[in-house]
Each structure stands twice: as structure tokens, then as C-alpha cells.
Amino acid sequence: MNDISSQTPGILATAREQVLQRGEGLSQEQVLEVLNLPDEQIEELLALAHEVRVKWCGEEVEIEGIVSLKTGGCPEDCHFCSQSGLFETPVRSVWLDIPLLVEQAKQTAKTGATEFCIVAAVKGPDENLMRQLEVAVEAIRAEVDINVAASVGILTQEQVDRLTAIGVHRYNHNLETSRSNFPNVVTTHSWEERYETLKMVKESGMEVCCGGILGMGETREQRAEFAAELASLEPHEVPMNFLDPRPGTPFADYPVMAGSEALKTIGAFRLALPRTTLRFAGGRELTLEDFGTEAGLLGGINGMIVGNYLTTLGRDQEADVDMLNRLSLPIKALNRSV
């Protein structure tokens, strides 16, 4: 008698038909199957993920720069974050002057980047921050040919409307991890509060940017859950961060995710989100180094943050651009959406 299991198509064969041919993302259960694949199948997974991203997103890679308008002093207890005022970390509260913000945007644009995101370490913006943000966005849009995004925490409907009115075309608010794992990561606000902000942003017409950090103690089951939750939002962009343990935070002693596990997660998320921009964000240098970064770019990733992150160092901007050129991956050109 033949082994029945040998007659059943593997998950990658199923994904080739479902995702590559029909453009239908994998379900939570199917994503878990991918995450449980042996390491020997990572190369096959990444090759399929690359085919999917080229077919449904195109060959171009979108480049983005980020800068912190307000660093540190945050009242929340996100256990991965050195900007929390509740932990003993080296980060201190500081505001960036608007002219310096504009200069950062100009430098980012010179790399070929189309996106520039202004970030603030807050639970949500007060009136002072909203006014600073309005001035900053206006100044950048007047002087720099780049799309402006924002990431300033949990919003009210009135704040969503104001950001839309000043020309913020994309809003980042990460869910960070799966709903079931969130209480292990943050206790001062809820996953639901973040989700509500994202729903308002989506309804406003701004593009939704929502991702998280991998390697924060979640199980593979919770990673699959997270992928399904993100897919339900139909975000324009999903930033994929990998935990870079920060001194003084509750996650300071967490192990760095294995590169093979990170690559498998990238491939799985691409198969769950075939039409979404998957962006390399913080932690890739530590988790994947150069070889793994290149493998990710040929395995489902089609966006990058260049330069430094909020509190950690990234790669040299020119080095990333050179890498894209070496891999024959074209940089996405600017398309003003607002």
C-alpha cells in the first residue's frame, strides 16, 4: 500500500498554485506549515517567495528613511524598547529641530528613497506634538521631493483627520506581535487600541503601514497568528523587525533569532501577504548580516529602511544601494500619492 502522506501535495506546492498563480495568501494554518518546514527547504521557500513578490508586487524595491522627532521619555512599557521612560536605558528624552529634520529628509531623498517617516516616542500625540508634526510635514513637502509618512502612536479620529489634511500619505503603527502574545510584550495599553487606530487610518484613505518585531518569545503558532492578523488589515506595507536586545529593557537578555528562522519567517509572511510591501527594518544587520539580507531580498522582501534606525545603528546608506545594484534589484521611483 502506498503511503498516503507521500501522495499529498506539500505546502510549497499548494502555495505555488494558491499564492503564485491565484494571488490568494496562505491561511494561518498554512503559514504554520511553512514555518515548520525543515531548514533544508528554506532555499526552495525563498525562491517561491521571490517569484510571488515579483509577480504580485513587481521587481522594484522601495527605499525609506526614518527619523525621530521626539526620542525617549515614553510612558509606555513596551519591553523591547529603550525609549521607554520606565526602564534604566542610555536613551534620554530629546526633540529634533525642524531644520535638522528637513536636512535628514534631503539626505534620505539623495539615496533614491521615496518615503520619509517621522517618528515620535509617545503613546499618542498631544497638541504640542501635533503642531510640531504639522510644521515638519509642511516644511519637508515644500523643500524635498519625497513622500512623508508618520508614526506617532495611538490616534483619535480628529488626529487622523488632521494628518490626512496635511498630506501624510502613510501611517505606521505596528501591532508588534500577535494578539495572544501582546500581553507578554506590553502591559500599559492593549493590542485592541492599536488595532482601532489602524482601522481609522485605513478608513481615512492614508496607506496603512503595520508590522512588528520577530523574536520576542513568540511561538511559531503565534507568528502564524500574527501573519493572519496583519493580512486581515490588508496593509500597504509590513515592516519586519528582528529583536535587537537593548540594554536596560526587560528583553535585554533575549537571544537573537537564528538567521534560518528569520528567513523562513520572511518567506512565510510573503506567502501570507502576496501584494504587500514587506520591508526590512530594525535588527536585520544583527540577525541576518549581509548574506542573510541578500537572501531576504531574493526571498520575498521588497522594501528597506536605509541608514540608522531610531536607537540602533543601521548599515551605511550607500552600502545598501550598492547591494541592490549588485543584486540587479531596481529602486522604486517616486510616485506622489498626495
Swiss-Prot record:
InterPro entries: Aldolase_TIM, BATS_dom, Biotin_synth/BioAB, Biotin_synthase, Elp3/MiaA/NifB-like_rSAM, rSAM. Its cofactor is [4Fe-4S] cluster; [2Fe-2S] cluster. Binds 1 [4Fe-4S] cluster. The cluster is coordinated with 3 cysteines and an exchangeable S-adenosyl-L-methionine. Pathway: Cofactor biosynthesis; biotin biosynthesis; biotin from 7,8-diaminononanoate: step 2/2. Its EC number is 2.8.1.6. Residues 59-284 form the Radical SAM core domain. GO terms for molecular function: 2 iron, 2 sulfur cluster binding; 4 iron, 4 sulfur cluster binding; biotin synthase activity; iron ion binding. It comes from the Bacteria. It is an enzyme of class 2 (transferase). Gene3D superfamilies: Aldolase class I (3.20.20.70). The keyword Cell membrane does not apply. [2Fe-2S] cluster binds at C117, C209, R279. SUPFAM superfamilies: Radical SAM enzymes (SSF102114). Catalyzes the conversion of dethiobiotin (DTB) to biotin by the insertion of a sulfur atom into dethiobiotin via a radical-based mechanism. NCBIfam families: bioB. PANTHER family: BIOTIN SYNTHASE, BIOTIN SYNTHASE, MITOCHONDRIAL. This is Biotin synthase. It comes from Corynebacterium urealyticum (strain ATCC 43042 / DSM 7109).
